[in-house]
């Protein structure tokens, strides 16, 4: 799981 905003 990745609870971080995507750089796109």
From Swiss-Prot:
Keyword DNA-binding: no
UniProt tissue specificity: Expressed by the venom gland.
UniProt keyword Iron, yes or no: no
Recorded GO CC terms: extracellular region
Modified residues (Pyrrolidone carboxylic acid): 1
Molecular function (Gene Ontology), one example: toxin activity
Compartment(s) of residence: Secreted
Function recorded in the entry: This peptide both inhibits the activity of the angiotensin-converting enzyme (ACE) and enhances the action of bradykinin by inhibiting the peptidases that inactivate it. It acts as an indirect hypotensive agent.
Entry similarity comment: Belongs to the bradykinin-potentiating peptide family.
Name of the molecule in the record: Bradykinin-potentiating peptide 8a
């Amino acid at each position: 799981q990745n609870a971080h905003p995507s750089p796109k």
